[in-house]
Structures are given as C-alpha cells and as structure tokens.
C-alpha cells in the first residue's frame, strides 16, 4: 500500500476525481461528516493523507507520502526535494506583481528601490526581484495581501491570480507575471527509484488521463 498526500481546499475535488479516474477512490475525504485525516481507498491499494496545500511537498519529500498533488506555486516557493511528475492541467492561475491602479507603475522595474513588497510567497518574490536586480523589502503576510498597498504598508504585492476579480475589487492591477501555475503530481524520488511497478502504473495512468482531459477541454 502506498500513500498519497491530498491538499485541502481548491484542488481537492479535482484531485479526488483524477485519482478516481485511475481506479483509486478517495471520495470519503469529500464527505462533510468525515473527520479522518488518513483515508484508505475503497480498493485497499492506497491511502490518502488530507493535509494543507503547503504541507503536501513536506510529506512527500520526507517519504511519508509517495505521491501528492500540489500547486506549482508551492513547489516554486518551497524548493523541496520532490519529483515534479505530471502537469495535471487544473487549478490554473499565475503569480503576479500587482500595485494600486492609481500608482502609475507599468512594470515591476518601475518600482522604487528598497520599496516594501507584501507576499505569502516571499521566496518566489525574492527570486524574481533578484533577477531584475531591484532591491526590495519583503513583508511576509499569511493572507489578504491586497491590504498591503491599500493601507500603504507596501508599494506592491506578489500573489497568485486566477480571475483577477479580487485585485480589481480592491483597486489593484497586475503589472508583471512571474510564472504560470497549475496542479502537479509529485513523487518521493527514492520511492520512485525503488518502485516495483505500482507507483509507475498510477503515474502512467494519471499522465494518460490528464492528456485525455486536456484534449477534451480543447474541443469544448
């Protein structure tokens, strides 16, 4: 039996659906009455750990889960030792720099040196601003980073954007995209090397299923 780390929140429904498509039923985690954090699949071949999105790579990197599904943004932020196996094509969004729409800034390079930038993704932000050779003061926030520019605490934010509605509703505008993100199937490198077949079988099935889904979406 192998273990899969599933992220609570926005990716959970489609993650469960993806595993269901390849024969692993973890639908019990979607039951509102469920309080178990470790749930076996109906077939008994695997079990799922229900964890926070940011904890998925941690469980996988330590080998407590052999597979997991997590956003690419989390992988970029944490840089843990996990294998990025398959782009699953859902949970799509992008990481962007945003400012107040009234600021007049048109790109990240327009920001003044040593200005404050608020973000939940400070490692991603640091890497980006280092690349464009702009020194900034990073302010780590755990949520509602839009309040940084609104309150005047920060000149800009670095955050995930899906539809952009939250930014618009709060008078903010994107000025630069760092990278695109989507859900990824990740694996524990050593477990993959020692695998006698079961893990690779699931990985191959998920890769085929994700490609089928992408083709199907493209025809709609």
From Swiss-Prot:
The keyword Membrane is assigned to this record: no
InterPro entries in the cross-refs: ATP_PRibTrfase_cat, ATP_PRibTrfase_CS, ATP_PRibTrfase_HisG, ATP_PRibTrfase_HisG_short
MF terms in GO: ATP binding; ATP phosphoribosyltransferase activity
Pathway assigned to this chain's UniProt record: Amino-acid biosynthesis; L-histidine biosynthesis; L-histidine from 5-phospho-alpha-D-ribose 1-diphosphate: step 1/9
Enzyme class: transferase
Positions of disulphide bridges: none
Pfam families, alphabetized: HisG
CDD domains registered for this protein in UniProt: PBP2_HisGs
BP term (GO), one: L-histidine biosynthetic process
EC number: 2.4.2.17
Presence of keyword Aminoacyl-tRNA synthetase: no
PANTHER family: ATP PHOSPHORIBOSYLTRANSFERASE, ATP PHOSPHORIBOSYLTRANSFERASE ATP-PRTASE
Domain notes: Lacks the C-terminal regulatory region which is replaced by HisZ.
HAMAP family: HisG_Short
NCBIfam families per record: hisG (TIGR00070)
Biological function: Catalyzes the condensation of ATP and 5-phosphoribose 1-diphosphate to form N'-(5'-phosphoribosyl)-ATP (PR-ATP). Has a crucial role in the pathway because the rate of histidine biosynthesis seems to be controlled primarily by regulation of HisG enzymatic activity.
Assembly information from the UniProt record: Heteromultimer composed of HisG and HisZ subunits.
UniProt protein name: ATP phosphoribosyltransferase
Species of provenance: Prochlorococcus marinus (strain NATL2A)
């Amino acid at each position: 039996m192998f273990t899969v780390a599933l992220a609570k929140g926005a990716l959970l429904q489609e993650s469960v659906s993806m595993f269901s498509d390849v024969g692993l039923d973890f639908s019990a985690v979607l039951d509102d009455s469920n309080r178990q954090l470790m749930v076996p699949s109906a077939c008994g071949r695997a079990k799922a750990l229900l964890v926070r999105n940011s904890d998925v790579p941690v469980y996988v990197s330590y080998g407590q889960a052999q597979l997991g599904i997590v956003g690419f943004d989390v992988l970029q932020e944490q840089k843990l030792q996990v294998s990025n196996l398959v782009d699953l094509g859902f949970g799509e969004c992008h990481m962007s720099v945003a400012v107040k729409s009234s600021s007049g800034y048109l790109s990240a390079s327009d920001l003044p040196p040593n200005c404050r930038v608020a973000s939940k993704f400070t490692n991603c932000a640091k890497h980006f601003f280092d690349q464009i050779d702009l020194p900034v003061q990073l302010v780590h926030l755990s949520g509602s980073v839009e309040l940084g520019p609104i309150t005047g605490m920060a000149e800009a934010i670095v955050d995930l954007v899906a539809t952009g509605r939250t930014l618009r509703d709060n008078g903010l505008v994107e000025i630069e995209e760092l990278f695109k993100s989507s859900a990824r199937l990740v694996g524990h490198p050593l477990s993959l090397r020692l695998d006698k077949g079961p893990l690779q079988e699931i990985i191959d099935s998920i890769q085929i299923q994700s490609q089928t889904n992408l083709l199907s979406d493209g025809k709609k």
